[in-house]
């Protein structure tokens, strides 16, 4: 769950994005006389609940403004995997991915036009999050900061950076702590981060799968997680889990884009 002060910004940004796609589709793929259109939003793992909420707001907004119904299909998974799926043919009208680099992959295969990052406010990053630790109630391992994740015997759960955008932010947050602790000594930073990943018990393909491993399968002592994912878990299981905010984290900036080539192929 994102901070309340962020909600209006998120809503406006998503409305702008979906509105843009809706305008393009209005008189093309759905036909002038049809009363329903379809938008496919390919997103990263832990955004299901966010977009379920805002899809409903957008549907009501679009119906009131244009008198047409809109069906928004959601697709979720690890951010890198989702980008590759679009490249391989997944029919995405909109991508809302965890990393700008994942979206940029679509430009390399000409699915996005150059300059896409400047098409929407905030360099096409409508909201931010950060990285936190989710631990079991009472914090039995007394985990307070990144150095605790490197201690012998601590079992860490984090997704795979090869497929998960959130996992990349996790890595960068750990690296940032290493910079704070070891300054410019890159070898010490590398060894520190390596020691954390040496404690990883399970490395799932995406952030939601990692949460499932920690929460439902009861594996690990600490989950490195998106703040919104951790907050949602504590809200659902207040007697089982708690959040630890490390001394150093990172400003994670997910990125959105309209997939130009797919929109044009649909006659827009």
Regions found by a protein language model. Give the residues of each.
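Short beta-strand->loop
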Residues: 116-126, 234-250, 258
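Ligand-binding pocket segment of bilobal, Venus flytrap-like solute-binding proteins
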Residues: 182-247
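Solvent-exposed loop/turn segments at secondary-structure junctions
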Residues: 46-49, 79-82, 100-104, 138-141, ...
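A conserved helix-loop-strand patch within extracytoplasmic ligand-binding domains
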Residues: 107-180
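Early extracytoplasmic/lumenal segment of secretory-pathway proteins
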Residues: 7-11, 19-109, 119-120, 226
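A bilobed periplasmic-binding-protein/Venus flytrap-type ligand-binding module shared by bacterial periplasmic
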Residues: 130-139, 252-268
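Alpha-to-beta junction loops
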Residues: 89-95, 153-155, 216-225
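Second-shell loop/turn segments in exported
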Residues: 37-41, 85-86, 92, 120, ...
């Amino acid at each position: 769950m994102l901070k309340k002060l962020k909600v209006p910004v998120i809503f406006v940004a998503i409305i702008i994005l979906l509105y843009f796609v809706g305008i393009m589709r209005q008189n093309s793929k759905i036909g002038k006389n049809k009363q329903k259109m379809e938008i496919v939003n390919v997103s990263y793992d832990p955004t299901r609940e966010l977009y379920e909420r805002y899809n409903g707001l957008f549907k009501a907004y679009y119906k009131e403004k244009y008198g047409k119904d809109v069906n928004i299909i959601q697709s979720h998974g690890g951010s890198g995997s989702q980008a590759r799926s679009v490249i391989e043919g997944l029919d995405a009208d909109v991508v809302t991915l965890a990393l700008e680099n994942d979206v940029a992959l679509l430009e390399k295969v000409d699915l996005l036009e150059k300059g896409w990052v400047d098409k929407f406010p905030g360099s096409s990053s409508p909201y931010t999050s950060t990285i936190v630790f989710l631990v079991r109630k009472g914090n039995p391992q007394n985990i307070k900061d990144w150095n605790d994740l490197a201690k012998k015997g601590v079992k860490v759960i984090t997704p795979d950076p090869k497929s998960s955008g959130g996992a990349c932010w996790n890595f960068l947050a750990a690296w940032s702590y290493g910079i704070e602790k070891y300054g410019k000594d890159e070898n010490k930073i590398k060894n520190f981060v390596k020691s954390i990943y040496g404690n990883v018990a399970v490395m799932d393909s995406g952030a939601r799968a990692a949460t499932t491993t920690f929460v439902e399968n009861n594996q690990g002592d600490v989950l490195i997680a998106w703040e919104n994912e951790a907050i949602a878990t504590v809200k659902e299981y207040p007697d089982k889990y708690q959040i630890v905010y490390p001394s150093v984290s990172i400003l994670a900036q997910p990125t959105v884009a309209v997939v130009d080539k797919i929109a044009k192929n649909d006659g827009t």
